[in-house]
């Protein structure tokens, strides 16, 4: 850059930039002299904010050059058009956050903060940003811009929504900075009367600055009595001489000179900035009650709900009973100690089966006849109907003593609904066990070996002998799902807030890198996952009777929970980079977590899936982690078991693969987590 250009703090040379089919800059030139206020005027949508972002380096020109005297971000103070501040921080915390990012000492932050309070008439410093008015918010935003005493100050519509009297005081303060501290200020405004206070102004229209100079010189040049009249004259002349500028296939041949770069990402991770980000994100989390509830308390509540509602035996199911032997209300007094083969016995063994079912918490209701019982079942009033004939006990003697003479009319009869397979299977199993128990009780009371009524088969359970319910074998998959889901909700919520509210973009102007933000988020996510996962595991395996075998594999069980949280965290970042709102981001999380839960055996074993679908399900991270965790908990497999090693390695490989996808996508889609406002 030649020396004469350095009489300017900012110099834009032959800038071209297009959006879609319309050019925003069409050979724009701009000169901002040192120690002056430059007022940039123009209608809404003409590209003023885009020009400022190009100067800051967050956007690039298609061609042309921007030369700056400033070479460090710290030398520039930028106030975006939108607020771009964390709403859950107080004004005091916001100043401390940005002061730390600019590597200011605490003492210097306090001194500068007191100056800005007096200058900008800021509200109570303990007020949350989200609770103050729009005008107050813009004053805080301006204060953040001035906090680190920058040499070049760039303000995008700083006085919008501010009281006219205070607006004048702010202008007086800016003029004083220029005179006493030799600051250079670029300010965009819609208020033409404000522009009269600037040392130099530029009117931007149709992609160029149609005029640039001191306000008095422009008024004199066009023989106008005010700046507004002069600009109206300029606009009329431009409309008469130019057609609207549209992008054509012709390529601009202007050489693209090297522009000054302020937004170069830092090569080293700054732990001071990470500490500031940790503090900010911690405040944002614990003051966002709904997010804190979702990512910490809700997993604990869901684990409790799971243990109370999934996989247990169904209770209080209604069964209609017709017992021609005895009223079922009298069965509670039945004593089975007498043998039915004794003379003059009055035993009614149907009571054994009825009492057995009652002990399983079935609701038994007596009906008068078979037709009524069957109709109640067919009309979905009851789930089953059981009939014991009048001579059931006497015929049972025949069944045991002379089996070949036992008639079909002596059988107990059952009619049940088939609309719910789980209900049907449980009732059928329990009634079968009740009749088996009835026969065994009869044999025992008559001093016979009750094993006569058992199957001639020895059953040896190798693994899972304590597994009694479906929930026992799906608890691990549920914990893996919770670890994935709630970590992903945290990362997608925080990152989309940073992205959509412009918070990350503004922090990057203060030197923050995306890597530093991700490190701070990752630390908080791990703290959350360790906290709620520990409590959830205690609930699932200590407070509720889900079986677990204590072995060295428990360490790997915990590691798998943490790895699943990493996968969820990374997937949330991916969704945040691809989606524009929290609504879409959260729905992606819901859909993917539910799909994995369905396909990984959390609802039904994958053995019931088609061969092709099962081959896909076996590769899902939730399946890999959940199956390995089940093997550790229910089979007692240890760290050195091949299946544990393979399952853990494959789950970790998913996290690495997702990380590589994020890195690659960030190279292809630049600024996918950043929106500059």
For every predicted segment, state its role.
Residues 189, 259-472, 642-644, 664, ...:
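Extracytoplasmic/periplasmic domains immediately adjacent to an N-terminal transmembrane anchor
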Residues 212-213:
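ABC ATPase "signature
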Residues 96, 100, 108-124:
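Conserved ABC ATPase "signature" region
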Residues 56:
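Helix-to-loop junction immediately C-terminal to a conserved catalytic motif
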Residues 221, 301-310, 325, 467, ...:
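Membrane-spanning alpha-helical segments of multipass transporters and channels
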